[in-house]
Amino acid sequence: MADTRRLRVACVALLLAAVTAACDTKAQFAPSLPPAAGFRVDDGVLKLWTGTVCDGVTGLTLIFDSGTQQSTEQVWTAPRPGVPVERMDLLRTTGPPAPDSGGSLQVQKPLPADYDWTKAGSLNFSVDGPKAYGARVDVAQILRESARHPSGSYLFGQRGWMDASDVQRENQKSFLTICTPDPK
């Protein structure tokens, strides 16, 4: 009877070890490198730089304070087949909520008139149309640090402030721009 008990314990331990070893902690469709997009504020305007061109964009979404009661979003859309996007003025820090992009992307869902995005903790950004990844950035850091960096440098989330040569050198090595295919 003791031998049967030991055999059961050994089988359970072996099964537990196999199940634990088989667990993958990464999301099934997560890219092999962290994705990022660049943001900065110049002359009171929140600016986007995707780092590389995103072709065929049919929509852009900014979500402030995602997952909280204060969560709110602004959405831009463009007709199919979409438009190329690399740099874009997104929002003003004061005054009317959105500058006129003058392009094919038009505000479909504006932020509420009384919403002050500069008080948000985070900004989540996503692109519709091409295969793309989302990006997240700290709003206070953008506002606080933009003036300290040259106008060609943008905050790429956890990657920090990067200019064109930094993005070209590091894209597909230490991070992915949001529209860069995963190299793996």
Label the model's feature ranges:
Residues 99-178:
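Extracytosolic low-complexity repeat regions of secreted or lipid-anchored proteins
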Residues 1-11:
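Bacterial N-terminal signal peptides that target proteins for export
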Residues 19-22:
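C-terminal motif of bacterial Sec signal peptides marking the signal peptidase cleavage site
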Residues 34-88:
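Short, surface-exposed binding/anchoring microloops in extracellular/periplasmic proteins
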Residues 31-33, 40, 170-184:
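Post-signal peptide N-terminal regions of Sec-secreted extracellular proteins
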Residues 69-115:
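Extended, solvent-exposed segments with strong compositional bias
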